[in-house]
């Protein structure tokens, strides 16, 4: 009788085929929380060389996946269990959607035979993700897996980047297929992948844009995280240097050109946007962050040249001139057009001089405030010390993750970015809770860089348990917590607000004063510091930065420093 192993070809299940498909299509990292029915999928992915970073919560894992997509230009992969795991993962998927970052969420789901019967964690997950997914696929048979994986990966990076979703039922994950057939399916998918078609000629739009910039008396270049995602830093540098036009980065555009660049208008923002007559806006949306491009913040007659990869965005904003295209490509074409007939404002140009003068004045005023050693700490004193410590780091610039109200607002003005994609913050939605996930994504995507998170205590609390994840993977991340005892700080209520049967309860904005956040990481073997003076903070930063090990620096802040809602109190 023949040995059965000699006659039966080797087989694999759906878990292995998902892992194989991801690996063959270039995926190197995954983030997620395992459980029924996807634990084996994570293990199989690791066995094939994919690094799986296991989190405590799908929200943080999803935020990590979205940021990884931005930092690398490749879709970040989130793996979740079914039902509530998928729902928790929506935080990351929606974050990718609103920030236009490539990401794919893969969730297990209940057995197809049990749909509608109240199965374990049953949910119509395709319907649940619809609002935040560019493309949602469900593999109904094991043989569909490679094609489904390929489609969601490709769609995530096509056109305007964003999140996609792949649903894999439990029975499909368990379904068997011969290894030879599986390999054939994966190979066929690899061969059939097509690059996104390049849009037709932009010659007329490029000529019009250059003409507008050439004739402008007070031109301004504005760029955002879309330009950073596009890797447009070299093209932007060339454009600014050949034209002498001042530039203004949005918060996550900082670093594409150094904040210290002579043509930076960051410290003269109000003057720059209020007086410019032509604004070239690249990879940045005219949303609330840029005051919708409307007066009184902007001149009512300003002419916008809007460069965006999304035609829908241009149709929404109705600029004077819209150019649909990738930021790197379009800026390169502008440079080529200008080269044929160069123009440069020059440092002595009145517009350039006025921007430079105002930036210098505002910078000097800020430095006077920063130079003061205020104890108990306000926000400025520790932020200056952190800035100086980050600038002193040798080698590649650290990635700065910023989250909070006052903490993020002050950090945006004080911390200096010199290299592209070295600042991650709450983004388009102003999302709190992204901090630790972003830190982990940055540490994984750029292992040669130190990651420094500057967090408010409220923002830190959303994902604080992920400090264990930092320690478990020994990531070079230092978390600096601005501990002012609550959301915005201490109890700021007026007498008329303190009444009723629960008036003795803490204010809705209050936390336990002087909480020992540094002890949380110590519970897992990381290093914790508590600091209340400039010398203590300098010492903690010097030691933790040099060690490049997981650490939490707990900075005690005056609970009444800062403002409620930071710079957005008018919206509260």
Swiss-Prot record:
Thiamine diphosphate binds at residue 58. It catalyses: an (R)-2-hydroxy-long-chain-fatty acyl-CoA = a long-chain fatty aldehyde + formyl-CoA; a 2-hydroxy-3-methyl fatty acyl-CoA = a 2-methyl-branched fatty aldehyde + formyl-CoA. Binds 1 Mg(2+) ion per subunit. It comes from the Eukaryota. Mg(2+) binds at residues 457, 484. One of its GO terms (cellular component) is plastid. Homotetramer. Catalyzes a carbon-carbon cleavage reaction; cleaves a 2-hydroxy-3-methylacyl-CoA into formyl-CoA and a 2-methyl-branched fatty aldehyde. This is 2-hydroxyacyl-CoA lyase. It comes from Arabidopsis thaliana (Mouse-ear cress). The gene is HACL.
């Amino acid at each position: 009788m023949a040995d059965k192993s000699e006659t039966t070809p080797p087989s694999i299940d759906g878990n292995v085929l998902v892992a194989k498909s991801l690996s063959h299509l270039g995926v190197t990292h995954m983030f997620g929380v395992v459980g029924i029915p996807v634990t084996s999928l994570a293990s199989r992915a690791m066995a094939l060389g994919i690094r799986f970073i296991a989190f405590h919560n799908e929200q943080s894992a999803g935020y990590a996946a979205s940021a990884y997509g931005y930092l690398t230009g490749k879709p970040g992969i989130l793996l979740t269990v079914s039902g509530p795991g998928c729902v928790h993962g929506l935080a990351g998927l929606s974050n990718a959607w609103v920030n236009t970052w490539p990401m794919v969420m893969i969730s297990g789901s209940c057995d197809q035979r049990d749909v509608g019967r109240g199965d374990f964690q049953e949910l119509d997950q395709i319907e649940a993700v619809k609002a935040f997914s560019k493309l949602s696929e469900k593999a109904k048979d094991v043989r569909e897996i490679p094609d489904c994986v390929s489609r969601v990966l490709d769609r995530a990076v096509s056109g305007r980047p964003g999140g996609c979703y792949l649903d894999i039922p439990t029975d499909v994950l368990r379904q068997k297929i011969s290894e030879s057939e599986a390999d054939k399916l994966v190979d066929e998918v690899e061969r059939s992948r097509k690059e996104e078609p390049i849009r037709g000629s932009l010659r007329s739009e490029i000529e019009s844009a250059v003409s507008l910039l050439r004739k402008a008396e007070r031109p301004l270049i504005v760029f955002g995280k879309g330009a950073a995602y596009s890797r447009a830093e070299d093209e932007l540098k060339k454009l600014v240097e050949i034209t002498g036009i001042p530039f203004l980065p949005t918060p996550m555009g900082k670093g594409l050109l150094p904040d210290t660049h002579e043509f930076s208008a960051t410290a003269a923002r109000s003057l720059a946007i209020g007086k410019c007559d032509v604004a070239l806006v690249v990879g940045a949306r005219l949303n609330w962050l840029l005051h919708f491009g409307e007066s009184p913040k902007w001149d009512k007659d300003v002419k916008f040249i809007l460069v965006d990869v999304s035609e829908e965005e241009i149709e929404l904003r109705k600029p004077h001139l819209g150019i649909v295209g990738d930021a790197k490509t379009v800026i390169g074409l502008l440079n080529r057009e200008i080269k044929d007939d160069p123009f440069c404002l020059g440092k002595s140009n009145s517009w350039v001089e006025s921007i430079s003068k105002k930036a210098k004045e505002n910078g000097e005023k800020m430095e006077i405030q920063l130079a003061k050693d205020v104890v108990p700490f306000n926000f400025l004193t520790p932020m200056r010390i952190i800035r100086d410590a980050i600038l002193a780091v040798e080698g590649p610039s650290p990635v700065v993750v910023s989250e909070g109200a006052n903490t993020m607002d002050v950090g945006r003005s004080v911390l200096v970015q010199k290299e592209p994609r070295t600042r991650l913050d709450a983004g388009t939605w102003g999302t709190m809770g992204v901090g630790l996930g972003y830190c982990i994504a940055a540490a994984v995507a750029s292992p040669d860089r130190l990651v420094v998170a500057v967090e408010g205590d409220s923002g830190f609390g959303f994902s604080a348990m992920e400090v264990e994840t930092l320690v478990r993977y020994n990531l070079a991340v230092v978390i600096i917590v601005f501990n002012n005892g609550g959301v915005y700080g201490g109890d700021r209520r007026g007498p008329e607000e303190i009444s009723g049967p629960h008036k003795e309860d803490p204010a809705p904005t209050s936390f336990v004063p002087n909480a020992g956040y540094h002890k949380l990481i110590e519970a897992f073997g990381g290093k914790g510091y508590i600091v209340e003076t400039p010398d203590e903070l300098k010492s903690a930063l010097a030691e933790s930065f040099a060690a490049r090990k997981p650490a939490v620096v707990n900075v005690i802040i005056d609970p009444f420093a800062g403002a409620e809602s930071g710079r957005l109190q008018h919206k509260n």
